[in-house]
Amino acid sequence: MSGLYDAFQRRLHVTGTLVTETGLHIGAATDGLDPTAVDNAVVRLPDGRPYIPGSSLKGVLRSFMERLQNSPGHWLVSPGAPPSECLHNESRKDLVKQFKRQRRSERELAEFVWDHLCPVCRLFGSQEFAGRVLVADLMPLEDRVLLERRHSVAIDRDTRTAAGGALFDLEVVAPGTRFALSILVENPSDAQVRDLMVVLLALSNGEIALGAKTASGLGRVRLVDARIADYGARDVLAAAWGGARPSYSLAEYVRLLGLEAEEPRVSREALQAALAALGPEVTWQQAQAVLREVFGGERGA
């Protein structure tokens, strides 16, 4: 069973720039008496510039992948609830007691837990298993970042008028702000890489929103200039001696995904032709359709 972290086998490093297309608000905890301070401030660095917590981006990427993986009879969003296949926390507690009574090893328990996790938990992690995806905090690329203050008012659902005392300010990062993106994926399988690339394609097409008030149009972001380095232990050693690790653009890497499949259902030429027919502007829906046809709808392993 190759799901556990026995040894370093493969690492995926995704870099790029995340650009805000509309105002972005990721809130910070505020507790002050300054009457001039904004009611809902954005999270900031010590130097006052806003940043995007890696956990915030990881959360929306995971949520998007859950929606892609969901299908009738295979619902992943409610772990442990039928017909979900994912092991939930209470089941794990019972399993620990059972395995101890049977004097079974921790290794056996870990393998059992792995075998009963859904594809999303295997990639992004859960209470039972450390995730493979590591998203660093996204730092602003500009020395000075423009922030906007927007005035809002809550609406009473019954009267459809402004609720009393419900006027508040919302601080947002201005559109066009750039943040440096860095994602590491440790020991992913080929299927997990394909699933993650579909999610990144959606992010590059501006189809994933981030932060608060997304229903009101805030939080639209887009991944640009993405590069993917896919390397193993030998590549790490080669880099230590001055060698270069292979790196691809997102579009290039999507076209190469099927070439390392364990059991491709089409020839290399047919796969290249199918992906080339998509053109330079590949959407995640198109890529997902081709990859599912090639790999028979395989879900993340």
Predicted features and spans:
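RNA-binding basic/glycine-rich loop and surface signature characteristic of RAMP-family CRISPR effectors
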Residues: 1-154, 158-301
